[in-house]
Regions:
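Domain-terminus/edge residues, biased toward the C-terminal soluble/receptor-binding domains
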Residues: 162-332
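N-terminal hydrophobic targeting signals that begin at the initiator methionine
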Residues: 1-2
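A general, composition-driven signal for non-globular sequence regions
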Residues: 12-13, 56, 303, 311
Length: 332
């Protein structure tokens, strides 16, 4: 008789090799005041500098605005743009007063063109007010482990106020979380979007054209924050997120770092999200589970699943072609 075991696993339960756990600050090619590269599955730091330094992050905070809108399950609602939306300064999608747009349209305008008018319209519709929406932003930040983040608005403002404060690490955590949302992933990776009655919006994220494995990203800039950029990429099963704060050549830096780590590491998947048929058992996992291995050990290995006599999954093991055994213990 087949059995179903439900495995409750946190992001931190993913096993990785020891040589991926050191923070390497030796990169001298690019300048970034703060940067971090993390494994999106377990949020482990692969490399970084000033990763927990709190500072203004500009428009990359709109990733949070977008994910809250998408998680409201109201993306096909049609919204009448308020008058105040037309008065927002900075980047805009040029909404007219009383113009009707879907929440989905607004999310595209927010992510591709960084529209502050889109951010205002989203925030007042979903939150009832800017303050109400900001509470949702900070609540979500706390929920997903952004320990050094405080949002004060739905867009980027840091001219006459403190602005949205966060860290490179926290923003990479946010991008890792957001990219698990199907709609966010689709929007963030879209290079152009035609909004009826308004315009065709071209994505400001140049990394989409520069690097084929890019999953998406968000740019930002203010005089206080300087250039900010958060992105994600996937290759050989390995999902990585990167954030740079005050980096002048950020697109090139992100591409360089992705190429660096994808040339060294790969991901071996043992369990996918949902039901997995393993031998005579069905295993349900809340997350995808696996291990990160050096790229040279990515192929020709063997995956083993160890069950107890009663059919309980005890651990999983990967045996490389040179005999190294790497175990994933589920119940530590």
């Amino acid at each position: 008789m087949k059995k179903i075991f439900i495995i409750f696993l946190s992001l931190l339960s993913l096993a990785t090799l020891k040589n991926t756990k050191t923070i390497d600050n030796s990169n001298k090619t690019y300048f970034s005041e703060c940067y971090v590269i993390i494994n999106r599955d377990n949020l482990e730091v692969l490399e970084g500098k000033n990763i927990h330094k709190v500072r203004s992050v500009a428009s990359i905070s709109k990733v949070m605005t977008c994910i809250i809108a998408l998680e409201s399950n109201r993306i096909f609602d049609v919204i009448v743009a308020p008058n105040e939306a037309t008065k927002q300064i900075g980047s805009s999608i040029y909404i007219q007063e009383n113009e009707k747009l879907s929440l989905l349209d607004l999310c595209y305008g927010l992510m591709l063109r960084s529209g502050n008018d889109a951010a205002y319209t989203i925030a007042t519709y979903i939150g009832g007010s800017i303050d109400g929406f900001v509470k949702k932003m900070n609540s979500k930040a706390s929920e997903i482990g952004m320990k050094n983040t405080k949002f004060t608005n739905a867009s980027w403002l840091d001219i006459d106020e403190i602005g949205n404060l966060s860290t490179a690490y926290d923003m990479a955590v946010l991008m890792s979380y957001a990219l698990e949302n199907v709609w966010f992933s689709k929007i963030s990776k879209t290079q152009s979007y035609s909004c009826k009655h308004i315009n065709t919006w071209i994505n400001k994220n140049k990394l989409l054209k520069m690097y084929e494995y890019t999953d998406g990203g968000k740019t930002g800039y203010t005089n206080k924050a300087k250039r900010t950029f958060v992105s994600g990429a996937t290759k050989n099963g390995l999902k990585i997120a990167m954030c740079t704060l005050n980096c002048g050549n950020d697109f090139e830096f992100h591409k360089n770092m992705y190429e660096k780590y994808f040339s060294r590491l790969a991901f071996i998947e043992f369990l996918k999200p949902g039901i997995n048929q393993i031998y005579d058992y069905k295993i349900e996992s809340k997350k995808r589970i696996g291990i990160v291995v050096p790229i040279e050990k990515f192929k020709n290995g063997i995956k083993l699943y160890k069950f107890s006599s009663s059919g309980q999954l005890l651990y999983m093991e990967y045996i490389t072609d040179d005999g190294e055994r790497i175990k994933v213990n589920l119940y530590e």
